[in-house]
Amino acid sequence: MEIIRGAPALSTFRVQKLMEACVNAALPVRQIYAEYVHLADLSELLETNEREQLEKILTYGPAIEAHTPQGLLLFVTPRPGTISPWSSKATDIAHNCGLGKVKRLERGVAYYVESDTLTVEQQQTLKGLLHDRMVEVVLDDFAKADVLFKRTEPAPFKSVNVLAEGRRALEVANVEMGLALAEDEIDYLVENFVRLNRNPNDIELMMFAQANSEHCRHKIFNADWTIDGEAQPKSLFKMIKNTFETTPDHVLSAYKDNAAVMEGSVAGRFFPDPNGVYSYHTEPMHVLMKVETHNHPTAISPYPGAATGSGGEIRDEGATGRGSKPKAGLTGFSVSNLKIPGFVQPWEGSYGKPDRIVSALEIMTEGPLGGAAFNNEFGRPALLGYFRTYEQEVSSHNGVEVRGYHKPIMLAGGLGNIREEHVQKGEITVGAKLIVLGGPAMNIGLGGGAASSMASGQSSEDLDFASVQRENPEMERRCQEVIDRCWQLGDKNPIQFIHDVGAGGLSNAFPELVNDGGRGGIFNLRNVPSDEPGMSPLEIWCNESQERYVLSVAAEDLPLFTAICERERAPFAVVGEATQEQHLTLADSHFDNNPIDLPLEVLLGKAPKMSRNVVSAKAVSPALEQSNIDVKEAVKRILSLPTVADKTFLITIGDRTVTGLVNRDQMVGPWQVPVADCAVTAASFDTYAGEAMSMGERTPLALLDFGASARMAVAESIMNIAGADIGSFKRIKLSANWMSAAGHPGEDAGLYEAVKAVGEELCPELSLTIPVGKDSMSMKTAWQQDGANKTVTAPMSLVISAFGVVQDIRNTVTPELRSDKGETSLLLVDLGAGKNRLGGSCLAQVYGELGDIAPDLDDAALLRGFFETMQKLVAKKSVIAYHDRSDGGLFTTLVEMAFAGNTGLAIDLSALQGTDVERLFNEELGGVLQVSRADAELIAAQFAQAGVPCHMIGSLANDQRVTIKDGAREVFSETRVALRTLWSETTYRMQALRDNPACALEEFKLKQDKTDLGLTVNLSFDPSEDVAAPYILKGAAPKMAILREQGVNSHVEMAAAFDRAGFESRDVHMSDILSGRISLEEFQGLVACGGFSYGDVLGAGEGWAKSILFNERARDEFSRFFERDSSFALGVCNGCQMLSNLKEIIPGSEHWPRFVRNRSERFEARFSLVEVQQSPSLFFQGMAGSRMPIAVSHGEGHAEFASAQALALAEASGTIALRFVNGNGEIATQYPQNPNGSPNGLTGICTTDGRVTLMMPHPERVFRTVANSWHPDNWGEDSPWMRMFRNARVNLG
């Protein structure tokens, strides 16, 4: 084992935060220094030149410190027996650079702690601050790290002696293995193995437990129900299916695959043919949808829990039909009170929590980062979400008790597209190869399906930890590229049948695959790729290692499939063959035995059906006491409630522009305020048709009325999607995620009531279908504290996600109030019809109460009338702005619209009934519309004609104040800036805790700056002019290499931009160049695309660059290309970072910087303002002086120069091509207008001859006007960024 020092691991402010944590823990620590240390497992000693090459590969990030560190060494490494994603990708780079003697690279962080002598207890406390016990260990000596590379002998399976010891043997195994088997399931297994006359093996029991867990089998939703002594006619699932039976319209696949599919639009699908040439293929682009939860793992270890939750849902989408394409994501979190240090709110009590789960604050600090990081690296935009905090002692259905989300909801979902011929699974032919695609088996995530089916507190802590998985999104991206290549082949697609590997690992996935295909299978255990040879058969078969799919491929198609995988560098293995007989055999060649030998029907067939005999309960809760509520104080509290407050800290960490197909994300208007009601995507680059998603959830209402909570969730999702141009209810399909504390008094009957309200009544009445969903039935946390039994039980929680097909994405209405549209009026549509019920509201919550009566959708006709009227208005462009009324009531709706439009309001409540508090803060269904004053009465009359109450409530005000009156009486008045400050303080506090606090403060101050102009546009050219048109007509299109490495994810939109400019865009993978299949000699131009090559493990873009510099063939190819006078190149984002590391082979690039970690130390996804500079760059000719917004999505975009002199030389060279600026056109020095902290706002630079240009922002994602989060009304189809690509075509003549 070689040990190689690396760069400092922590920035100054990270060290400072660590020191503060030490002080808070009363540790006598004076100083901490941390640096990366690399470990190389070698097959033989390296030669001197090889050692030097390895050291160069492992040189990245900040400069390595020259000093010898002092103090107590605490060396944090990945847990022995696991292989970190960093390791697998860094090892790939070493191999691609020709270092075959490197068996494996691994990395740890060496902490050197200078302190007074620490007691054993203090050392344990310190270790707790330095490592994540879920995935890491702390060593006191570098030499001890060789345990990471230790190989152990495989362990055999174990049998459970049922034949001799009977049922008792299985009862003991059930507890010891954490199988969560029910009594009747134990009977079933004993009976079947006695019949088979053999003992079950541990692997078979674990496989059965996973396949039949509540998590996988949804026993409660399929159960027979008796409520209050009366047998119920339908199961929960049958009531959900009733929505499909009533309205099957436009549904192509429901209840039988990894996701549901509905009919989409016809558009030109853009992808490369088998020769790599991109083009449009006009065809139906059907829409798939799925929403998952990952609650249990997120409670234990939020980052990997949320990351793998997102990853699993993305795999569900990709594994739909015979392979499909995930497109856009949504997310959601429900947690208990945050109790932010220094910002604890009056309603946040201190009830405690068990040690084995983390706090709500930790979940919301780490969980969203995990989910966002996975989506970012995979390359799926995260466009929609919800966030609720709830934890309160209330009088509900079970009397007075604490209700809340100690067991959180972590929701991950999204939509994708699928080809018509691939919607249905194919036939698994007898003899077909059964394949696992993706990463290796690792000893992690054991028993996740069974563990998540228990209430938190029933399983032991070790089992809890074992049931959390780890994430490697770059591997999943590679697998998705394989799936993409397969579906792009149309009827020649080699995939017959595909499933993702999720709960239960291969033990659930392979049996499900063959069973669903009507086949059996013979498998060889030792063919499963595994990085841990000491694993037992159970661990190999049942672990939940992520980023894996199982699929069947006909034997004759195996060479084609193999070639695709090798090109994409996606690992795969043939593990078995499909058989005619529905029997499952798993052979182990190492021990020469069969750990599994079972008829499939024993595993998946006739397991006992559950019966639920339950009693209903009625909630009795006093009315909300209004007499002590002051409107001004209520405003302060409600705007500080995380459910209502600014959610920037959850949004800017997630890429929202990747694919180039995003039309509407969470951010709205020139000031990019996160208040959007729905997300909208374009179907493709050649159409205005698209897709929309929204969410709805009103979970606290269930503490008063289960049915109302469910109806309001459905209704809210419709109110949120109503601003998109969809047309008909029948074009909207819903996903329903049901969370409940099954077995808790009153909850089971309440769940039945809620499902019935939606499945049997509301949805059929509105022609809405629920073709997909998920349930999580163990939403209760129990523990002991100071000798007392404590519980926190979640409300019954229904989260609805609505998916619609959009007719014209240009018609989408957002909450941005417009002060440039002449005289306008604000209308309130009130579906609550003046009832003003306050039960379960945010107002009640912030005063520590629940209230007595929940708001409800009393008549479905009200929602139908509203939606149909709204859709006519949207299609005619009669609505200027729209925002629904929900959490925080009318007051919140109005001020959020004011924030988005940067305007004041003059509101008059006199048309509304009730007290001030009721009128402002009730959360009945409704919405506010801004319309032209000339149209206001006519529009109000249209709503009235549809049976929907509609009131004039005011207009915009020029004084930047929000003033609310009741006739002449002033009810409330405050400046917009003061309200925005209140609303944004929660996100500021969270950002300051999690990110660079200096950046967080700068952003908070910018939100309070009345003079901030937001995004502005000033162009020096006409964007509607196509300067390339004369050249395109000349004949053959010049060839453009659309270059990607493993992990790159922005290549398709880049190909589309160059295609529109008249180039032949060709897909070129680095493996094509390294293998010699393709030469750069063929191309006039090259573009290195954005993404996460090798997951950015050796510095962003650096691993990619080193695989070129240290590979003879690649270095030669690229050197020759850059030396050619006629060639040109563009590097964007990851491609920019990569090319900046190729300075030694790019003429005229000596002055270039390298790109390092953003100043905020956070991935930044922003829509930022830049100005084009005067430079020789061929891409920016004729554009100098133009100021316009552009998509920014990166974690390492800070331009770092070797010295101040080097920066001065770069400035003097005249090659700076782009700078971040503010709305006045001044160089942006403050965050977030300068999102990465680069000196002088630098974000684009070129060679001295202008042939090679680097830029961190993404012009390819915004070359269409509709892909810009905000733009002036007068822009046409092409945004100004299209000029760049056309300039490249003009340059070639």
Swiss-Prot record:
Its main location: cytoplasm. GO terms for molecular function: ATP binding; metal ion binding; phosphoribosylformylglycinamidine synthase activity. Phosphoribosylformylglycinamidine synthase involved in the purines biosynthetic pathway. Catalyzes the ATP-dependent conversion of formylglycinamide ribonucleotide (FGAR) and glutamine to yield formylglycinamidine ribonucleotide (FGAM) and glutamate. GO terms for biological process: 'de novo' IMP biosynthetic process. Mg(2+) binds at D677, E716, N720, D884. Residues 305-328 are annotated as: Disordered. It comes from Shewanella sp. (strain MR-7). PROSITE patterns: GATASE_TYPE_1. ATP binds at G305, A306, A307, T308, G309, S310, G311, G312, E313, I314, R315, D316, A676, S886. The keyword Metal-binding applies. GO terms for cellular component: cytoplasm. The active site is at C1133 (nucleophile), H1258, E1260. This is Phosphoribosylformylglycinamidine synthase. Transmembrane segments: none annotated. Pathway: Purine metabolism; IMP biosynthesis via de novo pathway; 5-amino-1-(5-phospho-D-ribosyl)imidazole from N(2)-formyl-N(1)-(5-phospho-D-ribosyl)glycinamide: step 1/2.
